[in-house]
């Protein structure tokens, strides 16, 4: 997922080419670019509002381009620090330039990288993505469902995308999961809705003042 300005340039180039397939791809990229902006806004919001907490919340991403870049960028733009857990791959990916340099870590194994994501997170926020996003989502839900990891907000940005991709109700109807398991995650559409979910779960108000202890690692 690319930034809206990049998506707009791609659309202009596709229109100039007259290639119908290219124009369709560019239109999809332009539509999906809204999530880049929303991830960027959410990261800025978390970084700014958590500054009043005893323990600030730091955005952690996979360190690469797209939505990962947007997450680090949002924190960077408000003068905050953010973490990148990058993965060494043969054809990608270089760390994005918005990660706090001393908080950029390189991993060789996906399993170790994912373990650190789960161990250190107080929430999982998923934007539309591919196999890697799905892997991290289902791993986290499985660990919470089975009691192997503490409960935390699992937020899925973009209900329309996720409901088209995964029919969770079918899993319930087929007896593969319980109806209660649908409560493991919540759909959100905006940065504000996501922050409200975090505030509700951990007991801090919408400005960031905390009433309870959100940093419990039990």
List the predicted regions and their residue ranges:
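Residue-level recognition of the N-termini of beta-strands and the immediately preceding loop/turn
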Residues: 55-58, 151-153, 182-185
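Glycine-rich beta-alpha loop segments
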Residues: 1-85
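Short, acidic/small-residue loops that bind anionic groups at enzyme active sites
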Residues: 79-92, 127-128, 141-165, 179-180
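C-terminal functional extensions of proteins
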Residues: 156-218
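Solvent-exposed alpha-helices and their adjacent loops that cap or buttress functional pockets
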Residues: 50-54, 76, 96-99, 116-120, ...
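Phosphate/pyrophosphate-binding betaalpha-module
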Residues: 60-61, 65-127, 131, 138
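Glycine/serine-rich loop-strand microenvironments at binding/catalytic pocket rims
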Residues: 11-25, 108-124, 141-148
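Short, solvent-exposed amphipathic alpha-helical segments in soluble enzyme
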Residues: 76-77, 139-144, 170-173, 202-203
């Amino acid at each position: 997922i690319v930034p809206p300005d990049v998506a707009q340039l791609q659309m202009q180039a596709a229109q100039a080419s007259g290639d119908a397939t290219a124009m369709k791809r560019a239109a999809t990229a332009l539509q999906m670019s809204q999530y880049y902006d929303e991830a960027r806004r959410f990261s800025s919001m978390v970084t700014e509002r958590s500054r009043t907490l005893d323990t600030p919340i730091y955005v952690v991403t996979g360190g690469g381009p797209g939505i990962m870049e947007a997450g680090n960028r949002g924190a960077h733009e408000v003068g905050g620090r953010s973490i990148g857990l990058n993965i060494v791959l043969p054809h990608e990916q270089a760390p994005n330039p918005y990660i706090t340099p001393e908080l950029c870590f390189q991993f060789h194994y996906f399993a170790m990288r994912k373990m650190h994501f789960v161990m250190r997170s107080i929430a999982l926020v998923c934007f539309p993505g591919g196999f890697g996003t799905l892997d991290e989502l289902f791993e986290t839900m499985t660990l919470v469902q089975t009691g192997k990891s503490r409960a935390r907000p699992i937020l899925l940005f973009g209900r329309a995308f996720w409901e088209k991709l995964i029919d969770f109700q079918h899993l319930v109807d087929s007896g593969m999961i319980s109806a209660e398991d649908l409560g493991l995650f919540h759909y959100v559409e905006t940065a504000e809705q996501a922050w409200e979910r975090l505030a509700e779960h951990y007991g801090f108000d919408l400005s960031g003042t905390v009433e309870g202890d959100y940093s419990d690692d039990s």
